[in-house]
């Protein structure tokens, strides 16, 4: 494990600002706050609120390589567009070496759609990502999202715990999973992940900042390692986005 690249104080707490949604969700995600269509907005939030890293796809990381270079980048290695339906598969688009050496990534991430009929390909691709990242000394973050016709509720406690365990079994340093609905059930997900750190997948915009912050509090009480939040920050106007960012980071690092 190479968490020292992103673990600033040695406590294993992480607040990632996710901005990889533009590929899969399209520009509609930016409509609530058009300023967020520019990665400059997100980089400024990350800088001002001291997020652990900002999450970019390859192209955004390349386009902004010289913009606020002091903000650490976590490069998302795979992705897909959101127009085609059916069983999801998110192919590897960016090699680990390119992310680290050309894009200056301090960590790399990969999505696995657990339960998809294409699951085996994604498991194999991520296993290789872990080996490549290990060779270069950078941590890996596994987005583990149960999805597909074989999956019922993707937030059922046993499904979330399974997702966390898969990340551990494959060698991920950090697992990004959905909220399972309660502190006790999320605690079991964290226990199931053993030494892999578990962070919350932020999800869709909540009606109020307080609603999302209550979930963050639950994650931390359950033994979670933090959050990877996107829409619940940058879909809000700048002042509100900055305020909730500071609240998120403070809770994670408390």
Role assignments for model-derived ranges:
Residues 1-11, 15:
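N-terminal basic/disordered segments at the start of proteins
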Residues 6-9, 26, 148, 236-237:
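Surface-exposed loop/turn and secondary-structure junction residues enriched for glycine/proline
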Residues 179, 202, 231:
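Active-site proximal loops enriched in glycine and acidic residues that flank catalytic Cys/His/Asp
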